[in-house]
Amino acid sequence: MTTVQEPPSVAPEAPPVSPQPSPVAQPPAAAFPAEWTVADVLEQLGGVPLHRVRAVPPPGMATEKDVLEAKSRIGRICELVDGVLVEKTMGCYESLVAALLIRVLGDFVEKHGLGIVLGEGGTLKVLPGQVRIPDVCFIAWGRFADGRLPPEPIPAVAPDLAVEVLSAGNTPGEMQRKLRDYFQAGVRLVWYLDPKVRSVQVYTAPDQVAVVDQQGTLDGGDVLPGFRLGLPEFFARVQTSAPGADKEAEKET
């Protein structure tokens, strides 16, 4: 008897699968009301001059990452305000004043083991989506969870004392906005140091200010008990010329 072998069964071919369309990227939500103009955005920022507002990323879309990239790629120091990169401006003389204040504050803070003092590179996330860079600031050790400065390039911490050295590029609205942000974040004391008239505006709240004039003495209040700085002596230490250079210039004239 002959056995007939059945041919192997062949599975039917699956019908062709239509390619799935690529997902369409959704545009980001508008950061500002649709009816706003650039003028409205600038007013929101406190009347900051247009040349200090970065166009990339588009205003309202910037993040903390963009703050770091602006510094590393194009050498611009920017704060993050409402999703907008706003350049910090400081002239050489203002930077010199800030540097001396860092030395004076730093010596006091180190001597008493109070915390740390940062300069104009101290980038801090003071509020969600708000990155501020005080020209000088003091942060007590108690502000840090484990008593250490966090390793992140932009730590989420508000200073106890924030100092801004005023320059020609600052606007009154900008500085008022900073006051609101600082105190909302938990800053206890703000100094606005005006090197032009050699005075300091001392804020303990956005609407509570005392002015120390050029002959006065600045103190640390409850934030830095025992700290005192005579403004005449301080500004006398801000050297803008080599020792004896002024006398030589007088001889030449």
What are these regions (language model features)?
Residues 2-253:
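Gly/Pro/Ser/Thr-rich low-complexity, intrinsically disordered segments predominantly at protein N-termini
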